[in-house]
């Protein structure tokens, strides 16, 4: 949906990991390998990062990998006939028509939290698009928020893994059109996991 380019394979691999609990024996190495692969992909000629900006952004900046930020979640899916259509504002002021697929509920830092999951109207991918902001937004992380892509689970077992949170393309290149997280996805905790802003 919002991946594109050769980064698609990297993010799909990470999203697939988000539908099952992490195996701590290889969890950290799996995340580290995916991050290295993304850095390599972003050095290609056809990525959002312009050649002149690659030294500024690469390698990408991350919080340390922390399995505590990979939390089990329940997913309440809205029936297709009852799915709300939402006009999501974007970085280029061209609203996106999104469909609210359902809600992920989980406990983190002792708080019960919820995130709405979406996909773009007409999109047939088997992933949940979860844009969010948190108490690090505009400080250690991109002020406009970060994204998660979570694979749909046939078993109903979901893991929200914030170690896989990534910046939208408009962070690297303002010509890209990126949806802004809705108000309902503003988390009241600091998500010190996933991608940061350069130099933080």
Predicted regions mapped to residue ranges:
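Acidic, glycine-rich flexible loop segments
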Residues: 130-166
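N-terminal secretory signal peptides
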Residues: 30, 35-103
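Mid-length scaffold segments of soluble, non-membrane domains
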Residues: 79-143
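Bacterial N-terminal signal peptides that target proteins for export
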Residues: 1-7
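Bacterial signal peptide processing site
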Residues: 18-20
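C-terminal motif of bacterial Sec signal peptides marking the signal peptidase cleavage site
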Residues: 14-16
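Extended, aromatic/histidine-rich regions of cofactor-dependent oxidoreductases associated
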Residues: 138-140, 157, 165-200
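Terminal leader/tail segments of proteins
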Residues: 84-88, 153, 184
